[in-house]
């Protein structure tokens, strides 16, 4: 269990002490998608959704979620985020909304959970705003695609 930093010697969950770590620039990029019927995607593209501007609302929800990650994930450190961007674009070929979140900070720990939370909540928002016309939607492929900064170095999973 020594590789699992969120567990103490007895195997109990604990918050990692990052106090002695140096502040460095940290960035994480996460992606995910919402798959829907082609007719739903067409209505989304046309702005013809009963609940309003779905993509704008999803972007704002994702940004808000990144800032609230420590409230949702028990051992996640509260961080001063210096940048959060959430993009949602329509992919007609796959009948999906592709979501990407980029999060940055200068701090002692990474922002992977914030980026993943942003994508997840943006996807849930899209689902919520479209479910009245498409209950078959699927949220998926949520993953960390890139991170930089910190002792563990860079990670790329594109």
UniProtKB/Swiss-Prot annotation:
E.C. code: 4.6.1.17
Active site positions: 128
Source species, domain of life: Bacteria
Phylogenetic lineage: Bacteria, Bacillati, Chloroflexota, Chloroflexia, Chloroflexales
Protein's GO biological process: Mo-molybdopterin cofactor biosynthetic process
Subunit structure: Homohexamer; trimer of dimers.
Catalysed reactions, semicolon-separated: (8S)-3',8-cyclo-7,8-dihydroguanosine 5'-triphosphate = cyclic pyranopterin phosphate + diphosphate
Chain's role: Catalyzes the conversion of (8S)-3',8-cyclo-7,8-dihydroguanosine 5'-triphosphate to cyclic pyranopterin monophosphate (cPMP).
GO molecular function: cyclic pyranopterin monophosphate synthase activity
Keywords, in A-Z order: Lyase, Molybdenum cofactor biosynthesis
Family named by the database record: Belongs to the MoaC family.
Binding site for substrate: 75-77, 113-114
Species assigned in the record: Roseiflexus sp. (strain RS-1)
Pathway(s) it belongs to: Cofactor biosynthesis; molybdopterin biosynthesis
Enzyme superclass (EC): lyase
Protein name: Cyclic pyranopterin monophosphate synthase
């Amino acid at each position: 269990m020594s590789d699992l930093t969120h567990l103490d010697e007895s195997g109990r969950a604990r918050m990692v002490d990052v106090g002695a770590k140096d502040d460095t620039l940290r960035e994480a990029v996460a992606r995910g998608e919402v798959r829907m019927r082609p007719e739903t995607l067409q209505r989304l593209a046309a702005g013809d959704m009963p609940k309003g501007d779905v993509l704008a609302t999803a972007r704002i929800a994702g940004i808000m979620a990144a800032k609230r990650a420590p409230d949702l994930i028990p051992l996640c450190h509260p961080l001063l985020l210096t940048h959060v961007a959430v993009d949602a674009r329509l992919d007609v070929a796959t009948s999906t909304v592709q979501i990407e979140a980029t999060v940055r900070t200068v701090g002692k720990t990474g922002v992977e959970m914030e980026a993943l939370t942003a994508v997840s909540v943006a996807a849930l928002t899209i689902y919520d705003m479209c479910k009245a016309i498409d209950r078959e939607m699927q949220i998926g492929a949520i993953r960390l695609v890139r991170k930089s900064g910190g002792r563990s170095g860079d990670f790329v999973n594109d």
